[in-house]
Design a protein with these regions (language model features):
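All-alpha prenyltransferase/terpene-synthase fold signal
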Residues: 1-379
Length: 379
């Protein structure tokens, strides 16, 4: 590992899922937790080893979001499900690393597409280095993930290719938007399935494929992963409106202000046909999104000798910020946000229903807790 590499992140199943001694109390369950924790340490050490480039710029940019932390949701899921077989085999550890690196790569690209300013509590990569470098850093990470997967055999290569295709299609469909006659909410859920559900489903499938677990568990865990991924993203839509930036790592309403489509906004559009309050909220969202973009364009212009335009811009931005803070509060307190939370819980229940073919035991118990934590989280 390079001298400038970030320290290994300490991940714990007990900490991430709340699997304390009261919840997982039997000797078998405690051994299960310890085995997954050992696997997480191997994955983390491997991430530091794999995300390393001889080129200084490539090394700094690709390690940037790794060093910023992360929940390691996908490796945790792979390692949990691997306990249905032989546990953290070399193939399991490698696949978990590849999936997490793929996820990291997608974050670089997502932040460029969404013009996001913050990620994991730090300025986003394109804010630091610009769009071109951020995109290329993501490409390098995708390439490194593919290198790891190439050592796992033809089935793994095909799975990685299919997942990458779905990630791209999800981003494409999100960018283009629904076609005339499409249901915008159904379109949005399809986008979430491709952009988020596909990779979490891949992580779940890998837990069976590379652990020697019975192949009949592949379809149930794949469905679980896809549906819990949709639930995960819907809760992100709720978290975007949170007034606790210290927990979320970004300003309240980041997606809302950037004009990113979320389920609360889609629900507002649905209601606005007959509801004056929803229509008023939508108009205010559109006004602030347009004003924010206009202010950003003016701030990018060459400065003049006259300080008055800069002072006017700062004054306008201050007013916009105050208006927007009130708008976020109104959307957060509106029924559309609670409806989004309820929809996330529905997807989580469907995900758990898919696990019925799995045997009772610590794996199913941990996956149930995994689903609960996805919809209970605040960051």
């Amino acid at each position: 590992v390079n001298a400038g590499a970030p320290p290994a992140q300490r991940n714990s199943l007990g900490r991430s899922l709340g699997l304390g001694e009261k919840l997982f109390a039997t000797p078998t369950e405690r051994r299960f937790v310890a085995a997954v924790d050992d696997g997480l340490e191997l994955v983390e050490a491997g991430l530091l080893r794999e995300i390393a480039f001889a080129d200084d710029i490539a090394d700094a940019t690709t390690r940037y979001l790794l060093a910023a932390g992360g929940k390691r949701v996908r490796p945790t899921l792979t390692l949990l499900i691997a306990q249905l077989g032989d546990g953290a085999t070399p193939g399991i550890v490698a696949s978990a690393q590849a999936t997490e690196i793929t996820h990291l790569a997608s974050l670089y690209h997502d932040d460029v597409m969404d013009e996001a300013q913050m990620r994991r509590g730090v300025p986003s990569a394109q804010t630091v280095w610009g769009n071109n470098v951020a995109i290329l850093a993501g490409d390098l990470l995708f390439a490194r993930a593919s290198t790891i997967v190439s050592g796992l055999g033809q089935e793994a290569i095909l799975l990685q290719a299919e997942t990458f295709e779905r990630l791209c299609l999800g981003q494409l469909h999100e960018t283009v938007g629904p076609r005339e006659g499409d249901d915008p909410i159904a379109h949005y859920l399809d986008v979430l399935a491709d952009k988020t559900g596909s990779l979490i489903s891949t992580a779940a499938r890998a837990g069976v494929m590379f652990s020697g677990a019975p192949r009949e568990y592949l379809a149930p865990v794949a469905e679980f992963g896809e549906k819990i991924g949709i639930a995960f993203q819907l809760i992100d839509d709720v978290i975007d409106l949170s007034d606790q930036p210290a927990e979320t790592g970004k300003k309240a309403g980041t997606d809302l202000r950037a004009g990113v489509v979320t389920l609360p906004v889609l629900y507002l559009r649905q209601l606005a046909r007959t509801d004056l309050e929803a229509s008023s909220l939508l108009n205010e969202i559109d006004r602030i999104v347009d004003a924010t973009r206009a202010a950003a364009q003016r701030s990018d212009c060459e400065p003049t000798a006259d300080d008055a335009p800069a002072a006017d811009l700062a004054h306008e931005t201050s007013h916009l910020d105050a208006d927007f803070a009130d708008l976020v509060r109104r959307v957060r307190e509106h029924d559309v946000t609670e409806r989004t939370r309820v929809e996330a819980h529905r997807w989580a229940r469907e995900a758990l229903d898919a696990l019925s073919p799995l045997p009772d035991g610590p794996v199913k118990k941990a996956l149930t807790r995994f689903a609960d934590r996805v919809v209970e989280r605040s960051a």
